[in-house]
Amino acid sequence: MKNPYFPTALGLYFNYLVHGMGVILMSLNMASLETLWQTNAAGVSIVISSLGIGRLSVLLFAGLLSDRFGRRPFIMLGMCCYMAFFFGILHTNNIIIAYVFGFLAGMANSFLDAGTYPSLMEAFPRSPGTANILIKAFVSSGQFLLPLIISLLVWAELWFGWSFMIAAGIMFINALFLYRCTFPPHPGRRLPVIKKTTSSTEHRCSITDLASYSLYGYISMATFYLVSQWLAQYGQFVAGMSYTMSIKLLSIYTVGSLLCVFITAPLIRNTVRPTTLLMLYTFISFIALFTVCLHPTFYVVIIFAFVIGFTSAGGVVQIGLTLMAERFPYAKGKATGIYYSAGSIATFTIPLITAHLSQRSIADIMWFDTAIAAIGFLLALFIGLRSRKKTRHHSLKENVAPGG
């Protein structure tokens, strides 16, 4: 039987194609925005940082409320905030007002996350990991398409703002589509009697689980965020690549992340435990980073770009969220809020640390990321072993129950 929520899921995924564009729109149009806002690159960078602050400010709050009031209102609110950002950022010459619109875009990201991830897990309860990993494919697709769109606008000598307008147009059409779609029921609509049939400890997330998954949310985000920001500079100034070649490393990185999504999704759905992939991908990320730090040569860096895109940016963050959400079966929005709040903190702290390290050597930045990946692997190992222990314990209880 066809899943009735497939059209809804498709609309939710298209939101993240636009989100993928939104994340890099200002950085790719930096020169034009400098002129528009009468500022310099540092001023535009300050506005870009507002996205992270806006995201963190409401993420946990939005997740909790989505469990109570439903997913649709927050998804629609996120789409409206994003459209306001796309239009507003182009119609101001004041950097302070631009910062406010950037903050609004960060809030939009939080509202979408709080409603989308739980909706997909509730729409596809038998394959929540696959459903969430596909989000990454659409984000990467948006980030792959936007440079092509901007290149076309430059070639045709058209207004740079059309890149914002195209993103806003896709979001508007998708909002009309999703408004007519049916969303799966969320736990807040279910009768409390259902909870009485289940042991209170069976679905309770311990402090240890909460801490380990939250820390993994920070570590996994930090690992790929650092690479995405410094890969080109590492290729140019450490490996000795030309500027044009170092920029292409990001395209190789994106191809790796997309390929991982399409390989990982069927694996999780059919054969492999999510915890196994969590441990495997984190371990490979550590080995790749360690290798490129020891041998920063032309070809090693090219191979590294693909491998690190595959293992760190190809859905491992979403796998971690899916595993955490299993500990919160009646509060998936809360789980999403906690997990991505930890990840958002990484987007603040990592740039501060790397800014200091870059004054000494860009090579030190990758060594720092290697240390982060090592901690991430130990953490993934702990999560995996703990998850298997709980699964084994649950199986023993089920086997004993009939005889008791």
Where are the predicted features?
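Conserved MFS/SLC helix-loop-helix module at the cytosolic interface between two early adjacent transmembrane helices
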Residues: 57-94
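Helix-to-loop junctions at the C-terminal end of transmembrane segments
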Residues: 58-70, 260-273, 358
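Intracellular juxtamembrane helix-capping segments at the cytosolic ends
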Residues: 111-124, 314-328
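Helix-loop-helix hairpin linking two adjacent transmembrane segments in secondary transporters
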Residues: 127, 131-186
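A late C-terminal transmembrane helix in Major Facilitator Superfamily
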Residues: 325-361, 369
